[in-house]
Swiss-Prot record:
Pathway: Carbohydrate metabolism; tricarboxylic acid cycle; (S)-malate from fumarate: step 1/1
Lyase as UniProt keyword: yes
Protein name (record): Fumarate hydratase class II
Subunit field text: Homotetramer.
PROSITE patterns hit by this protein: FUMARATE_LYASES (PS00163)
Listed Pfam families: FumaraseC_C (PF10415), Lyase_1 (PF00206)
Main location: cytoplasm
GO CC terms, sorted: cytoplasm
Originating gene: fumC
Annotated positions for site Important for catalytic activity: 330
Function: Involved in the TCA cycle. Catalyzes the stereospecific interconversion of fumarate to L-malate.
Native species: Ralstonia nicotianae (strain ATCC BAA-1114 / GMI1000) (Ralstonia solanacearum)
InterPro entries named among the record's database cross-references: Fum_hydII, Fumarase/histidase_N, Fumarase_C_C, Fumarate_lyase_CS, Fumarate_lyase_fam, Fumarate_lyase_N, L-Aspartase-like
Amino acid sequence: MTTRTERDTFGPIEVPADRLWGAQTQRSLQNFDIAGDRMPRELIDALARIKRASAAVNQRLGLLPADKANAVIAAADEVIAGKHPGEFPLVVWQTGSGTQSNMNMNEVLANRASELLGGERGEARLVHPNDDVNRSQSSNDVFPTAMHVAAVTAITRHLLPSLRALRETLARKAIDFDDIIKIGRTHLQDATPLTLGQEFSGYAAQLQHSETHLNAALPHLCELALGGTAVGTGLNAPAGYAEQVAAELAALTGLPFVTSPNKFETMASADGLVHAHGALKTLAASLTKIANDIRWLASGPRSGLGELSIPENEPGSSIMPGKVNPTQSEAMTMLCAQVFGNDVAVNIGGASGNFELNVFRPMIAYNFLHSARLLADGMRSFNDHCAVGIEPNRERIAELVQRSLMLVTALNPHIGYDKSAQIAKKAHKEGTSLREAALALGYVTAEQFDAWVRPEQMVGR
């Protein structure tokens, strides 16, 4: 392998000649060969956008010559466009401030900008990773900013569209199924009737609340630490830089980023991400309940509840011919379990900041973005391959309604709880219908039973 010599404050180090990264990236590769969990692509993209915005603002403020600024901007645009993916090899398990990933971006952009200016990569480069690309910045404000930019982008561009699509599907099903009366269940036991549409309206409402929770978390995440530099005081950042770079990022992304009103909070804590991940966890809890309900209601086809039919997407067994399983529900509940685990990690990370800097940042970012990606992809898959194809089994639903003992609840206002309970117990013990048991006990006449026990009048209409 051909190498070139790069230097940092620790001295010279050999770097692969065909790579754009520099000394600090190479040292990180040597010192943190752990697990292979690379920094998420969303975070790399956010770092590139930050460097682009900073170069533009530093030029406007007279701190960076136009030729260098334009070269850094062009290099950052290449990264944003998906070029040079192999130049960001660092793992999550590194310094807790994300310094090495910040320097990875600085080095790559410095070397690439130098090439764009007609220079070389390496020690003779025309653009310096610290003095030019990282001007007016510190890893301590860059990395928290990248986390917020990546999180807001993931939520608004990927998660919320998937959430809305699934919510709208369930809301349509609620309308389509509104005339289907079914038996309710509490404690996994028969309860009073409701409509299948009412049941699905509950699912849609859960997702509507999650959408509200996520939107409520966004303003905190839109506050950016950039301009706080090392500890939040803004040392070495010029006046106006923080406000201008936030505005530049807002224009670049189309998202409402602003400078944080208190950069000590934004750098020392990860409360915005902890709060937002709580909304992701709540969404995962809702999706687990919805996916579980649907697979239980579709259980069978002959020996289960069988109230719903779901799409048959693939064979379900390597030994039982013809078996089809609720695989989308299974995938959904598994990924939601992973989100619950990620939430624990994010909470521990958020609680573990000391003094002026949280140093669990790469781990928090990794788990947050993992959760957002899982939920976005999981909801899209569940919607496309399950929810849109759900159909009611009307005959089975009607059969279970007629067999339910809990229709006796309609008699409570007329003959009282105790007599109604006697009717239900007698019917259950003797295997008869409620009507037969009620008439045998003499508590009601046939006409009264038929007038009072009417499922269509028991669903709140």
